[in-house]
A protein has these predicted regions:
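Short secondary-structure transition/capping segments
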Residues: 2, 44-46, 82-85
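C-terminal structural segments of small proteins and small subunits
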Residues: 55-87
Length: 87
């Protein structure tokens, strides 16, 4: 379950999301690997869920590794808002 205001980062391949997981675990950034919520579509069935508190750090690490998410959404009011412009 995705909490209110949390972010969901989607990668369009299982390889990329698993690589992101490995990098973020090494960097000790707080996140969860989750199934992509039904309301969102993706070629990959997994996504990263993280809080607004770690958003800047997490996205910077992934960008430095050349592994930015393909899409970014934020849970707000029970819906997922497209936050890809924040990438």
């Amino acid at each position: 379950m995705v909490k209110e205001n949390d972010y969901v980062a989607i990668f369009h391949s299982i390889h990329r999301v698993l690589k992101a997981e490995k990098i973020l675990k090494h960097e000790e950034v707080s996140f969860l690997l989750i199934p992509v919520p039904r309301q969102l579509t993706s070629d990959c069935g997994l996504a990263l869920r993280f809080s607004p508190d770690v958003k800047t750090e997490l996205l910077a690490i992934l960008a430095d590794e050349g592994l930015p998410p393909a899409e970014l959404f934020q849970r707000s009011g029970g819906a997922y808002l497209d936050a890809s412009s924040q990438l």
